From Swiss-Prot:
UniProt protein name: Large ribosomal subunit protein bL9
One function term, GO molecular function aspect: rRNA binding
Chain's gene name: rplI
NCBIfam families assigned: L9
Chain segments annotated as coiled-coil in the UniProt record: none
One GO BP: translation
Record flagged with keyword rRNA-binding: yes
Entry similarity comment: Belongs to the bacterial ribosomal protein bL9 family.
Keywords of this entry: Ribonucleoprotein, Ribosomal protein, RNA-binding, rRNA-binding
InterPro entries per UniProt: Ribosomal_bL9, Ribosomal_bL9/RNase_H1_N, Ribosomal_bL9_bac/chp, Ribosomal_bL9_C, Ribosomal_bL9_C_sf, Ribosomal_bL9_N, Ribosomal_bL9_N_sf
GO cellular component: ribonucleoprotein complex; ribosome
Length: 150
């Protein structure tokens, strides 16, 4: 299905690009989320009429994400969990735990923003983690996993 992107989507394209995606991806995710419209003549004309408004909105979203990136870059976030004698956790530190620690530090983040390429953190130590606030604004933070006092 041919669609017009209404915002920049990583791995797909930029605002205003006409791309071909699978029908289910367009119908079930992109169109209901307001990220795209079908590439019909009427929708193309409507998009061109609203292009400046959409570009301004995207610039505002990117500026907000970059401001949060400035606050977050280089920060150290501490997460405490029960650990055994050998320093391994009974459970693991997930992206939800890290997002909660970031929010506790006073910066807006959701678990979908936290990137853990090697999976959940299972041992005590310090880890470099990326927080993708926008496709063009990725902050690098240090997560210090410590053993909780019992």
């Amino acid at each position: 299905m041919q669609i017009i992107l209404l915002e920049k989507i990583g791995g797909l394209g930029n605002l205003g690009d006409i791309v071909t995606v699978k029908n289910g991806y367009a119908r079930n995710f992109l169109i209901p989320a307001g990220k795209a419209k079908r590439a019909t003549e009427a929708n193309m004309k409507e998009f061109e009429a609203r292009r400046a408004e959409l570009e301004a909105k995207q610039a505002e979203i990117l500026a907000d994400a970059r401001a949060r990136q400035e606050k977050l870059d280089g920060q150290t976030v501490t997460v405490a969990q029960k650990a055994g004698v050998d320093g391994r956790h009974n459970g693991s530190v997930t992206n939800a735990d890290i997002a909660a620690a970031i929010v506790a530090a006073g910066i807006e983040a959701v678990k979908a923003n936290v990137r853990l390429p090697n999976g959940p953190l299972k041992a005590v130590g310090e880890y470099e983690v990326e927080v993708a606030l926008h496709t063009d604004a990725v902050a690098k933070i240090t997560v210090a996993v410590i053993a909780a006092a019992e």
